[in-house]
């Protein structure tokens, strides 16, 4: 008889739940819930389990916030809960709550070539460290290492490191944003709002008045080539995305590859392919030859968070990935 576990990927707007086959990691019966329709994560889980009528005793939920203790408070929603209390309330034998990019990193060993698009480099070295990052509402970062036949995710808040300007143009951008924001993190550039920040800073650095644009406006005008400032912003976004990925590669020697997740890049994929992304990734001065063979992949799987939550849980239960 097939045994299932509950897996989830929860953000500020949507909570996506699914079943994961414990033996092989297959994800099925995924369903997306609006977080605005429920008072708590537990209420969403109960609604889902009531529909599926499965005997579930194990769960793993990925959430877009730091996970440091039993008590979890979402940063982009008002849900807060005790993991141990939720586990008891649901009568689960185990319940894991992990960071969303911990889940994405754990998906890497489960991905097939059909769910990856390569941008330069050669082939990934087996069992070598991996880096994962992605721009969306924020900038998520994680690393993955292989130790004693187990994959270990190294989560953190790498999206909040300082933005490092590396050209005269970027110096001007940093000057404008520092005046507005004080501390300028990488996430202030590499995110949906970051794209708007880039556009605004480009215009203001030229002593002009920017329009009140949304991220989608900047992207659409850039792709339609109807706004030079928007096109410059999107081009700079791709370059800085490459440079940031190259920094991650240097940090841990990620010869297992650097993987891009998140919802922004697929919206302008052809533009991204033709951009200065890969050149910026390799632009490491004396260490250009070091990073040159490291492959970069865009994850195209529909549910990497669910896949990774399942992988994390299965490994916790003793399965070898």
UniProtKB/Swiss-Prot annotation:
Catalysed reactions, as listed in the record: D-glucose + ATP = D-glucose 6-phosphate + ADP + H(+)
Alphabetically ordered keywords of this record: ATP-binding, Cytoplasm, Glycolysis, Kinase, Nucleotide-binding, Transferase
Binding-site residues, ATP: 8-13
Chief location: cytoplasm
Source organism superkingdom: Bacteria
Molecular function GO terms recorded: ATP binding; D-glucose binding; glucokinase activity
Entries under SUPFAM superfamilies matching the protein: Actin-like ATPase domain
UniProt GO cellular component terms: cytosol
GO-annotated biological processes: glycolytic process
Compartment(s) where it occurs, according to its Swiss-Prot or TrEMBL record: Cytoplasm
A matching Pfam family: Glucokinase
Top-level class of the enzyme under EC nomenclature: transferase
EC number: 2.7.1.2
HAMAP family attached to this UniProt entry: Glucokinase
Family: Belongs to the bacterial glucokinase family.
PANTHER family noted in UniProt: GLUCOKINASE
Protein name as it appears in the record: Glucokinase
Organism expressing this protein natively: Erwinia tasmaniensis (strain DSM 17950 / CFBP 7177 / CIP 109463 / NCPPB 4357 / Et1/99)
Taxonomy of the source species: Bacteria, Pseudomonadati, Pseudomonadota, Gammaproteobacteria, Enterobacterales
Gene from which this protein is expressed: glk
């Amino acid at each position: 008889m097939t045994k299932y576990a509950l897996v989830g990927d929860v953000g500020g707007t949507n909570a996506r739940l699914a079943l994961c086959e414990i033996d092989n990691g297959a994800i099925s019966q995924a369903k997306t819930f609006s977080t605005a329709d429920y008072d708590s994560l537990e209420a969403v889980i109960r609604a889902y389990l009531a529909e599926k009528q499965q005997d579930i005793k194990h769960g793993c939920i990925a959430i877009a916030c730091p996970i440091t203790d039993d008590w979890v408070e979402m940063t982009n929603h008002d849900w807060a809960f005790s993991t141990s209390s939720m586990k008891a309330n649901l009568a689960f034998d185990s319940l894991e709550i992990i960071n969303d990019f911990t889940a994405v990193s754990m998906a890497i060993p489960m991905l097939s070539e059909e769910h990856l698009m390569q941008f330069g480099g050669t082939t990934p070295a087996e069992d070598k460290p991996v880096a994962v990052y992605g721009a969306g509402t924020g900038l998520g970062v994680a690393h993955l290492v292989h130790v004693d036949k187990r994959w270990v995710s190294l989560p953190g808040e790498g999206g909040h490191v300082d933005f490092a300007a590396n050209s005269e143009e970027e110096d001007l951008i940093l000057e404008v944003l520092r005046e507005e924001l004080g501390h300028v993190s990488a996430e202030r550039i590499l995110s949906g709002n970051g794209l708007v920040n880039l556009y605004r800073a480009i215009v203001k650095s030229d002593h002009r008045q920017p329009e009140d644009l949304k991220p989608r406006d900047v992207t659409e005008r850039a792709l339609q080539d109807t706004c030079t400032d928007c096109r410059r912003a999107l081009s700079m976004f791709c370059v800085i995305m490459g440079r940031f990925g190259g920094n991650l590669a240097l940090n841990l020697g990620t010869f297992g590859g650097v993987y891009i997740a998140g919802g922004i890049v697929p919206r302008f994929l052809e533009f991204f392919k033709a951009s200065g992304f890969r050149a910026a990734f390799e632009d490491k001065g004396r260490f250009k030859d070091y990073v040159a063979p490291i492959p970069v992949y865009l994850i195209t799987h529909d549910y990497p968070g669910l896949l990774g939550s399942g992988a994390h849980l299965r490994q916790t239960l003793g399965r070898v990935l």
